[in-house]
Amino acid sequence: MRSRLLVFFSFALSCMSLSAQVSYRSAETIEYIERFHKTAIREMYLYNIPASITLAQGILESGSGRSPLARSANNHFGIKCTDDYKGKRYHQDDDRRHECFRVYSTPEESFRDHSLFLLRPHYADLFKLRITDYKGWA
């Protein structure tokens, strides 16, 4: 009987801890959306990229702005350096060790570069979709 109670309480504590983590992460995501929704909407009007897609990718790539890359380099989309990139650089392990990522002065600059990045020919088919077709964009 005592061991069953111990198992039950352990399980209950685990569930409460998990619930708190999910709630905390949800709060972080809501804060991220509140902070950057106007930026994403502006980019949508300028570049025809759905704001929901921009926000979703920023949330996933940056952990709602909490990742080391977002905090140290204002890079919310995991955009890496290219051969022609002349700006500041931030290095961290990713797919490979010590990869080079772009550094931005502000998060908003990162959002703009994300829009410009999606204008590359590789993503041209996305722009054939309606801006309201978020499933197609995803």
Where are these regions (language model features)?
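Bacterial Sec-dependent N-terminal signal peptides
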Residues: 1-24
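Catalytic cores of secreted/periplasmic lytic hydrolases that degrade extracellular macromolecules
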Residues: 18-138
